[in-house]
Amino acid sequence: MKKVQKALLVLLRAGLWESRIEDLSCFPMSAGEWKNLYLLSRQQTVTGIVFQGIQYLPEHFLPAEELLVRWMAETDAIERKNMQMNKALELLVQWFTESGVQPVLQKGQGIASLYENPLLRECGDIDFYFDSRQMFEKAFSLIRQCGLRGKVQADQSVTYAWKGVEVEHHTCLLDLHNPFLQRYAKELEQQYGYNHMSLEGGQDVRIPSPVLNLLLQSLHILKHALGWGIGLRQLCDMARSCYKLHDEVESEEMKKIILKLGMDRWQQLLHAFLVEHLGLPVAYLPYQEIASDSSPLLDIIWRGGNFGLYVPGHQRKSQSLLAGKWQTACAFQRNIRFAFRYAPKEGFWVFSSLLKGQLK
């Protein structure tokens, strides 16, 4: 691992757990190395958490004041965007609730609440799941009545902008593409159900129960790891979720579910990464089985950054739909060995769905 990458992980662990820095061997760093570390933290969308980690560095190891001021301004922008997101989420949930629609908040601000300082986690969009087709259609009808332009995506999700924030509506809670496991996924949803969390203004919103929450994130990370790539932010989310939800998850049950989904090798790899690189104590894993080597996942993370946006050739908006599908297919092909080593069945069906244009 390169010096800058190692230093990033050291500072990330300190910021993620708000604890002292355990390894100072990477420091001091040159101005050029600090600049690269800053850019890498932005690529991985962990700028605010790494800045928090810098607070634990001895003064003589700190970067130049000019970069610190720039980093501070970027962190302040992240906090302000989170506050905007929280207000938009509150208003949208309130409107849906008053209209008889009960969304389930996926990831996002629900996961942010598990951080020591939620405002430092970089937010993306608002993801809602609707547990019936009727509820999904009612929500879609409501946004159209308000003049919002909802766009139907290839995977049948709906996207639109609400008060400056991108919102997505989903018909599936778990990113599971194996058709032979869809019934089991629904059974899990019915068995474990949902919890409630209070938003800042006091409005309640449904969130996945701890078991579903951990499964949702694991599958989400896997899907993106198989394609363009995944970033450190999503792995930090998983680490914080394991830590905060540990007492609400029964390890033998979780292991049984993972085995039935055929994800045991993947889960062991994920566990190894969380422990080795993000500092999650082994005792807080959903169950204590760990791969001997986490480097295959680490390689994917360094290669692509946040959802693979920094992979050479990755374009958010391709010149054509066909070109976009081709690019995504090529991205998956690069990870084909990874897929069939760690999640062969799910990897096969993710690729099949991708070819049919069912993935974003």
Language model features with spans:
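Conserved NTP-donor binding/palm subdomain of two-metal-ion nucleotidyltransferases/polymerases, i.e.
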Residues: M1-G124, F130-K360
